[in-house]
């Protein structure tokens, strides 16, 4: 069905308490977007706009979460789990559209202000930023960068933190033995990274069950925590590594100037081998960024 049909259905449901009806409509809209995208190569922004509207319409979180789950579960996760380059580009475009919707809500004022401070006033500018990062070759760190502190963003899921984050921690600690290395993420990371490693954990929760606005507002919390960690450091004294973290919506949302930030596109790049394991890709990315070859296995 076309978006106009679903818009009519939504107009009839706006004041309903019928959660099953909301869920049914949200799932049909999300599935229609996916079907048209994969089978007709059509990115129809009207479907996404309607899902955003439904996911932020109600005053109670529970009804908003219904559509948020459909948007993430049916659309966003599907794009994330498909390691084709085109789906990565589409994910970036979609997230930029969602951010643009949210920043214009009454509750999105702080989100809008922070993005404006990064000179990212529009969805297109946000999109161009992440696409330039995605498409450019991995950039080696400049020699003048001698970080006293390295912040590594968690991948949020334990399995990915073992396979990717633990490798990054080992490589970085060997390259910068005198730096304070901190992983930002769930406190449960203490169960993954041994105390003997000397890696600090800066606790920050990301709820995968939250509403649409709440999922993106975690970026504001992350910004505040990053600024606390970096207080008093010059631009040559810190580094942030983002291994495709959900905390930044897979790199779409910025944290610091690009000179102090490196993003690992774990979903693959044109110059990455197509059949390499995620651990091999992580080491390959670190070879490029750190400027020397080494290989570390996941470690807990």
Predicted ranges, named:
Residues 1-300:
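Catalytic machinery of carbohydrate-active enzymes
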């Amino acid at each position: 069905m076309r978006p106009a049909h679903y818009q009519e259905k939504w107009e009839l449901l706006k004041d309903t308490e019928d959660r099953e009806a909301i869920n049914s409509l949200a799932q049909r809209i999300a599935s229609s977007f996916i079907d048209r995208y994969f089978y007709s190569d059509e990115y129809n922004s009207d479907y996404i706009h309607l899902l955003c509207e439904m996911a932020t319409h109600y005053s109670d979180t529970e009804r908003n979460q219904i559509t948020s789950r459909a948007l993430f579960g049916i659309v966003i996760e599907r794009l994330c789990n498909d390691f084709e380059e085109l789906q990565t580009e589409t994910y970036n475009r979609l997230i930029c559209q969602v951010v643009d919707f949210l920043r214009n809500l009454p509750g999105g004022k702080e989100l809008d202000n922070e993005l404006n401070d990064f000179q990212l006033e529009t969805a297109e500018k946000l999109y161009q930023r992440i696409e330039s990062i995605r498409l450019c070759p991995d950039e080696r760190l400049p020699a003048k960068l001698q970080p006293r502190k390295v912040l590594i963003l968690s991948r949020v899921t334990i399995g990915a933190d073992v396979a990717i984050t633990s490798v990054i921690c080992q490589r970085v600690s060997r390259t910068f033995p005198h730096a304070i290395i901190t992983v930002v993420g769930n406190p449960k990371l203490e169960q993954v990274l041994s105390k003997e490693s000397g890696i600090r954990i800066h606790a920050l929760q990301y709820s995968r069950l939250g509403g649409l606005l709440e999922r993106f507002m975690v970026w504001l919390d992350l910004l505040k925590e990053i600024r606390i960690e970096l207080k008093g450091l010059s631009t040559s004294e810190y580094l942030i590594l983002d291994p495709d973290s959900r905390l930044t919506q897979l790199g779409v949302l910025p944290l610091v100037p690009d000179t102090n930030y490196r993003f690992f596109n774990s979903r693959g790049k044109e110059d990455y081998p197509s059949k390499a394991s995620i651990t091999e890709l992580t080491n390959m990315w670190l070879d490029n960024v750190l400027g020397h070859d080494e290989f570390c296995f996941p470690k807990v």
